[in-house]
Amino acid sequence: MSINKRILLCLLLLLLVGGVSFHLIHQSPKYIAQKKEIEKQESQLVHDKDTKLPYTFLNNVIAQSGATSSVYYKSLDTGEVFYNFSGKMPAGGLIRPYVAAALLDAVKEGNLSLDETVTVTATALRKKSPALSKIKPGSKVPVRILLEDMMLDQDETALYELVRFIGWDEINAYLLRKGYADTILGSPDLVKTEETAEDKEKSETISYTSVNDMVTLLTRLYEGTCVSKELDAYLLGLMEKQNDRQLLGALLPKKLRLAQVSTSEGRVQNAGGIIYAKEKYILVIMTDKALRKDETMKTINQISSIIFNTVNDKEVFKK
């Protein structure tokens, strides 16, 4: 056999071995699992890398907040997005719309009803309950009222009674099923009577979410794909009636339509919502470990104002 034929034969053997190896690698369980995970990540509105906001000024404002911050903006008109950091953070009151969505999903499936009633006992009443603190212990409250009190008045008694009504495990199963990868419902002090070891373990957890998951939830509500068009519109309507605008809406026009949810609990200050401006957009801002609460609130106000003015083609005032 000539040298040329031997070289050609070697090349053919190398190609054959390479092809077999390539096929075996791409059919291996590990490779298939990795590929599916990548496809899953790409199909969701999830970003696991930090990116810079397009405006240096915004980055400077965020850097001066005195807190760990996550910011996510998404235009509902153009689809443009930008964000600064993204990861799981303490949810505080931002867990409320997830609980509401889980409830409405169960209602849609026929498993629960907004017309059912819950008996609110004296031991169930909590301090931060501007609505339900006025009722007589032992009163029967319709689930619809609990939902509205939770969303409109940030009523903690309403929140925890709804968690009892729906079920802690059921809510977390719903969050997992819907792809809210960073969101989990904690259950501090849910059990006020005798605690089992499992209950005690649950009581040591807190709720978490991320700007990614909040943007996904708000996008679905806006598009009517979260639960149903009718029930999504109902929940968004409650978010529009929420009067606490001290975070996202403090520096925005008072008549501006805003469907939002916010929370200010200790060192955690979070806000997220849909802003119906010249360009409709979603903005979610989450902060943690705020050393100076007033400064952090001011930072959230500034971020919201800067973005609003930018998308409305107004001059952004820079100190």
Task: Give the positions of each predicted feature.
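Structured C-terminal helix/loop/strand segments within mature extracytoplasmic catalytic/sensor domains
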Residues: S2-V61, S65, F165, T216-Q246, ...
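Solvent-exposed coil/turn segments that connect beta secondary-structure elements
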Residues: L76-T78, S86-G87, D105-A106, T123-L125, ...
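Acidic helix-start/capping segments at beta-turn-to-alpha-helix junctions
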Residues: D115-A131, I166-G167, D189-T193, L238
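Conserved catalytic neighborhood of penicillin-recognizing serine enzymes
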Residues: L125-L162, W168
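Short, conserved catalytic-motif segment at the N-terminal edge
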Residues: G66-K88
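Active-site SXXK
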Residues: G79, M89-V120, L283
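Flexible glycine/proline-enriched surface loops and loop-helix/loop-strand junctions
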Residues: Y83-F85, P142-I145, L152-A158, E194-K202, ...
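Mid-domain, small-residue-enriched loop/turn segments at the edges of structured enzyme/sensor domains
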Residues: L159-L218
